[in-house]
Design a protein with these regions (language model features):
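Hydrophobic positions on the alpha1 helix immediately C-terminal to the Walker A/P-loop
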Residues: 20
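Hydrophobic anchor at the beta1->P-loop junction of P-loop NTPases
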Residues: 9
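Glycine-rich phosphate-binding loop used to anchor ATP phosphates in small-molecule kinases
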Residues: 65-125
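Conserved lysine of the Walker
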Residues: 17
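A glycine- and Lys/Arg-enriched "phosphate-lid" helix/loop adjacent to the NTP-binding pocket
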Residues: 107-174
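Conserved substrate/cofactor phosphate-moiety recognition/catalytic segment
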Residues: 25-70
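The conserved Walker
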Residues: 13
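Phosphate-end processing signature that detects enzymes handling 5′-triphosphorylated RNA
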Residues: 126, 184, 192-366
Length: 366
């Protein structure tokens, strides 16, 4: 089969998707890839006469079901076209199937996908190689929030509209949580940094070597509630492998669902690496546990993922080993930018670059 990667570009209102799509086409076409883009289906439907704010329940239901049907049909048709091309292909979806669920009650969503013969796991985990979520400008870059670039946008540029946009942003992230390659792209002081981050994440998916990038890490104490966080329990096991390579299995449980992911990191030089990950089934996961590194213990931790002022954080509370250790890690914050710490986080120590606190080393048997 041809080398085809299908990627969802999603996010809250006014997140920069339109500009990012243009940059993706220009950048990867220049590298020899054929790039297909699938337009945002709800916008097409709105322009065609669909009213997603209607009080007519039957009209709303049929409209949402048709939206999903057309989304999947466009993706499947584009995939068949891509298979006829003798060069590597990237299919970029301006939103994907799970975005539709963000606007529906769980009951209505399950009814629609049941009628169409799908499950949430199939639509979220099996159709796309990666999901890139661009954080809305309503969260951390309010000065750039506008509705002028999309006449179909329903969230106004006032404080009430900004709050609606922030909540929708969180709903979309929640809908995609569980995909093995979900990446949240922060807002940045310089919008170009946000776009470059998108290109970097897609390059990772394509297996293009990338510079080794150190995310900032801190030992912290949580002093208040974290509203709107996505909570999950993680079991992480490292496998035996060749020198210069790190292989891990991760079992992640959230909202009663379990996802298994296999990740490989291979260092090509002191400043360049390739990272690949794939979702696997329970049987393969349990089989591969037989290859567990005997010199390392399994890590168990509870994770809270959240956005604060346009920046994405992961807060890990370790259960074993190192019970009581709480580490806050930034995701995709540019080197020249400052970290916007939430008021409910007290930083005790900056451990960025401290190899003692790499998960791989925390797992070492004492």
């Amino acid at each position: 089969m041809n080398n085809i990667k299908k990627i969802v570009l999603t996010g809250g209102p006014c997140a920069g998707k339109t500009t990012a799509l243009v940059r993706i086409i220009e950048h990867f076409s220049g590298l020899g890839y054929k790039v297909f883009t699938i337009p945002e289906v709800p916008t097409m439907f709105t322009q065609a006469g669909m009213n997603y704010l209607t009080d007519n329940a039957k009209f709303f239901y049929e409209g949402e079901k048709a939206t999903l049907q057309i989304q999947l049909a466009l993706e499947d048709s584009m995939m068949r076209m891509a298979q006829t091309i003798d060069k590597p292909v990237i299919i970029v979806c301006d939103r994907g199937a799970m975005d539709i669920s963000s606007y529906l009650t769980p009951e209505l969503w399950n009814r629609i996908i049941g009628e169409l013969g799908y499950t949430t796991a199939q639509l979220r985990d099996e159709r796309y190689d990666a999901v890139l979520h661009l954080v809305s400008a309503a969260d951390g870059a309010e000065q750039f929030y506008t509705t002028s670039n999309n006449a179909q946008r329903l969230e106004r540029a006032d404080e009430q509209g900004l709050q609606i946009a922030r909540e929708l942003d969180k709903k979309v992230i929640s809908a995609w949580t569980g995909h093995s390659h979900l990446r949240v792209i922060n807002n940045h002081d310089d919008f170009n940094n946000k776009l470059n981050r998108v290109l970097k994440e897609i390059s990772n998916v394509l297996g293009i070597p990338q510079p080794v990038e150190e995310e900032r890490k801190y030992i912290v104490e949580v002093t208040g509630d974290i509203a709107g966080s996505i909570d999950s329990d993680i079991v992480q096991t490292y496998l035996t492998t060749e020198p210069g390579c790190e292989v891990r299995l991760r079992k992640r449980v959230f909202e009663g669902k379990t996802v298994y992911v296999h990740t490989t990191k291979k260092l090509l030089s002191s400043n360049e690496q390739i990272e690949t990950e794939r979702q696997i089934g329970k049987n393969l996961y349990e089989s591969m546990l037989q290859q567990a590194d005997p010199y390392r213990v399994t890590i168990r931790k509870h994770r809270k993922s959240f956005i604060w002022k346009g920046q994405y954080f992961e807060l890990d509370s370790f259960e074993s080993p190192a019970p009581g250790l709480v580490i806050l890690e930034t995701k995709g914050i540019a080197k020249q930018e400052s970290v916007k710490f939430p008021p409910f986080i007290h930083v005790k120590e900056d451990i960025t670059g401290n190899t003692q606190y790499y998960n791989y080393n925390i797992a070492l048997r004492k």
